Each structure stands twice: as C-alpha cells, then as structure tokens.
Amino acid sequence: SLKQSQESSEYEIAYRSTIQPRTAVRTQSRQSGAYSTGAVSGGGGRVLKMVTEMGSASIGGISPALSANAAKSFLEATDKEKKEMQGLNDRLGNYIDRVKKLEEQNRKLVADLDELRGRWGKDTSEIKIQYSDSLRDARKEIDDGARRKAEIDVKVARLRDDLAELRNRYEDVQHRRESDREKINQWQHAIEDAQSELEMLRARWRQLTEEEKRLNGDNARIWEELQKARNDLDEETLGRIDFQNQVQTLMEELEFLRRVHEQEVKELQALLAQAPADTREFFKNELALAIRDIKDEYDYIAKQGKQDMESWYKLKVSEVQGSANRANMESSYQREEVKRMRDNIGDLRGKLGDLEAKNALLEKEVQNLNYQLNDDQRQYEAALNDRDATLRRMREECQTLVAELQALLDTKQMLDAEIAIYRKMLEGEESRVGLRQMVEQVVKTHSLQQQEDTDSTRNVRGEVSTKTTFQRSAKGNVTISECDPNGKFITLENTHRSKDENLGEHRLKRKLDNRREIVYTIPPNTVLKAGRTMKIYARDQGGIHNPPDTLVFDGENTWGIGANVVTSLINKDGDERATHTQKTIQTGQ
C-alpha cells in the first residue's frame, strides 16, 4: 500500500529579508515509481518541496495469477496516488495564491519600513535629547526618594519609640491611679472606722456625762443630807447643852431643896427639942423616914433623868456620828467617782481631740489625694490628647509621605518603562524590526503615563488636611470638658465625686481669633452636682432650659467658630478657674 511504501515526506520553508517579485512553475514527472512536485521561485527566497518515494519489487519468478493480482493492485495504487497528487496540487495552488497575497503585504511593509528608516536617525536623536534630562532628573528623584524614605523610616522608628514610651507612661499613670484609688479606699475605710470609733466614744462620753450629772445630783442630795445632819447635830448639841443646863438647874434646885430641907430639919429638931421626948422621937423617926423617902425619890428621879439624858445623848451622838461617817464615806466615794469620771472625761476629750485632729488630717489628705487624682486625670487626659494629636500628626505625615512616595514610585515606574522602551528602540535601530509598532507603543505609553502622572500629581497637590488640637486646664473641680466645634454648646463638668460646686454668677468668656469676645453669666444659685455635667446651649441650637443640667444663652445664637478659640470660666472674684483652647491648622500639598 501507499502508507507502507511511503518512506519520507518533507516540507521546507525558509524566510529571507529580501522580497522580490517571483514566478511559480508547476511540474509533474514520474520517474521509477516516484512523484515530485515543487515550486521554484525566481529569486530563491521561498522554497516549498514535497518528495514522495516508493520502492519497487522484483516480479521475476512468480506465477501469472500472482502477477495479474500484483498488476491490478499496482494500478489501483497508482490511481489512488494520482488522486492524492491532484489534491495536493490543488492545495499547493492555494498556498501559492496565499503567498502572493503575503508578498503584496510584504511590499507595503517594506515601503513603510523604508519610510521609518528615513526618519530613524532624527527620531532617535530627538528621543535621546528629550529623555536624557528626564533620566537624569528621574535618577535624582529616585535618590532623593530613597534618602527621604530613609528619613521617613528613621522618623517612623522614633515615633514608634515615642509611642512605646507614651504607652509605658500611660500604663505607669494607670498603675499609679489604681494605687491611689486603693490608698483612697484604705483611707476611706480608716476614716469610716475612726468615725465609728468616734461615734462610740461620743456615746460613751454622753453616757459618762449623764452618769456625772446623776452623781452630781446624788452628791448634792447627800450634801444636803449632810448639811441637814450637821444642822440636826447642832440642834442636838444645843439640846444637850440645854439639858445639861436643865440638869445643872435641877441639881442646883435639888441642892437648894436639900438645904431647905436641912433647914427645916434643923427647925424641926429645934421644935423637937422643945417637944416631949416621945413626940420628938416620933417626929424624928417620921421625919427621918420622910427625908429618906424624899431623898430616895429625888435620887431616883435624878438618876433616872441622868440615865435617860445619857442614853438619849449617846443615841443622838451615835446617830449623828453614823450619819456623818456615812456622809463622809459617800462623799469620799463620790469624790473618788467624780475624780475618776473627770479623769475619764479628760482622757476622752484628749482622745476626741486626737481623733478629730487625725480625722482632719485624713480629710485633708483625702482632699489632697482627690486634688492629686484630679490633676493626674487632667494630666492623663492632656497626655492622651497630646498622644492623639501626635498620632494624628504622624498619620497625616505618613499619609503625606506615602502619597509623595507613591508619586515618586509612579514617576520611577514611568521612567523605568520609558528607559526600557528607549533601550528597545536603540536596540531595534540595528535590527530595524517592528520600528513602527515600537514607535506607536512609545507614543501610546508616553501619553498614558503622562496622563496618569498628571492625575497622581493632581491628587497629591489637591489634598488639604485640617489638624485641630484641644488643650484643657483647671484649677479646681470644675472643668470645661467639651466645646462644640460648630458653636452649638459648651459643657462644664464637676469631677469631684461628693462635693457640689456653686457656679452662680460665674462667667463664661469665649474669645474667637483674638478679635470677638462672647461673655455669658451663669444665673445665681446654680449648683453643679458632684460627678454631673452642665450643657450651656446658644439660642436656637436645640437646647432646653432645664437647670442645672441644661441652660440656654439667649444673648447669642451661636458660641462662634474660628481657627483659634479660647474658652475660660471665671468666678465671681475674677479668677480664672478653667480654660479650653482649640487650634485649627490647614495644610495643603
């Protein structure tokens, strides 16, 4: 078969730069069972050759039937090969027509190439002159960009260090603040314990005072009883003296009666001496009996009176002595009790004075700690504001530097592209292949990059940034916490946790750009509660007059806006107690 007998098939296509008109010759020949078809160009520029070779077999020594079959197969193969050759010849003709069209296009391209070659030297020199300065400027800008990038890296590193330091300071302030809070809580607990102990001592002091009053009353009562006992003693002493006088009188009367009786006895004896003996004896006996009876009676009466007087006197004396001893004992006990109570009262008064002094010191220390805490809070807020301002400034600088760096990178990329294109153009000057396409690419790329560069420059140079900084300060518990940038309201805050502040007749003064000044006087008896805020709205700015939370300034419809605004709080004495400063700076590239 043709597939088994075909040994080789070869196509060769060669391209040369010289293009000339050519003629095509189509030949067909048969030699020893081989077919050859070729296209020969007059100039030898393009050659298309197809070679088909077939082997022949010896037919000697075979039978007639086999030779007839072989001849038939050979003829069928020959017819098939003829048809294939016809198809191949048709395809070759189509290829030749296509080659003619391509040669026509090549002639046009050769003309364009000649035209470009005529302009090559002029355009190359102009491009070289045009881009030499740009390349030099680009290299300089690249160097400047690298130097500025290094400076930016140094600034960023320094700002990172500053940020780390501020973070450490913030953590330190936070730690100290927590420590101060713990100390304040401890002092508050100590104050509460001291106050409870003080209340207990005051109750004890009141109890001792009442006990002292009761003892003073008992002492006065006992003193009155003692005075009464002394008066009774004096009366009893006078009575004893009176009774002694009576006894003396009775003794004298008894002595007088005894003398009278003796006189009477003598007289009776004289009478008896004159009377008869019996009568004298009788009267003598009777008289002796009567005298003895009278004497016995008087002795009994005197003895009984004496015993009664002595017993009554001893009883009264013992009663008076017992009362006096009892009064002395009670008086000494009361004196000791009063002395002890006075000592206790003195000790309690000393302890009370010490506790009051300690309480005053603790309250003063708590007040100082509150002031220090407020100062630390203000310093912390100022540090936070400074940090925020620094971060905003750093972000703005970074954004500006990034924009400049992006512009430099865009310029560098544009210059790198132009350098690459310029290098290709210089390299293509020798080969002169595709010059027109490269020139068109240069023109299009340059126009596109110039447009992009213009947009980038417009974006960078059209950027305007606004930086606003706030600064607050206060000399007490009231601060100006917020000032609306649009001039709607001003907010005052009492930072103390337990102390109210009277802001009556205080003045708010707002100075705009060192020109206009707005002054508002707070109504009398306006009290800002501890830990609360007060908003003062301008007229028609949405505020409702609800003291002390919100006030409305009817004198102005705005607090004013400006680039440099200073708001101050001034008390009745004209002292500045708080300030709020707002500065706005606009920067543009």
Swiss-Prot record:
Residues 1-84 are annotated as: Head. Residues 117-130 are annotated as: Linker 1. Residues 434-589 are annotated as: Tail. This is Intermediate filament protein B. It comes from Ascaris suum. Belongs to the intermediate filament family. Residues 466-584 form the LTD domain. Giant body muscle cells. A and B can form homopolymers. It is found in: Cytoplasm. Residues 131-268 are annotated as: Coil 1B. Residues 446-470 are annotated as: Disordered. Its main location: cytoplasm. One of its GO terms (cellular component) is nuclear envelope.
